[in-house]
């Protein structure tokens, strides 16, 4: 099948096999129920590598809100209700991401952690200076602090050693789910972390790096 099976022994006791509408369901409601119980979920445990320690909120350095447990909670709930098979994503090239986003932005993302640690830093990489009106916008900085600000709109986009791998796997999850639907599945759920809906053509922000839904 498409993708790699993450959970071979999924409890299927909740799945519905009868075509009859059971008591308490309208035909339309039961159809939705059946579709959801046939739906594949695409998920990658590689998101666990993206585990920022802190973020800047309301003038204070606080524990990061966007953390692995957010996705893990949903993953565990999918299993608990027997929503359907959970599969891993296939690997996808970044060609489409570079059509949605500026290629130089996508090329920058895998380099952030190495650039950060090359300066002797060990904590979460966060931007703290941003280009403002009146400064030249046609020249990209070549130092990591300037580059982080150049490619972001807030300080909610921390990087640690596993962040890029999580970004890439989230991108792959979305594309794999999209292909399942294109191949005839009625529905597929892309359980993406980090999320992507705030990311723009040339910038990250709001915990988002690649706009997964736009790419898919």
Model-derived features with residue positions:
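HDAC/HDAC-like amidohydrolase catalytic core signature
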Residues: 37-216
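N-terminal, intrinsically disordered charge-dense segments
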Residues: 12-18
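N-terminal leader/targeting segments
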Residues: 4, 18, 38-41
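Positively charged N-terminal leader segments that act as targeting/secretion signals
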Residues: 18-30
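Intrinsic low-complexity, disordered N-terminal segments enriched in polar/charged/small residues
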Residues: 3-9
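Generic detector of N-terminal low-structure segments
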Residues: 32-35
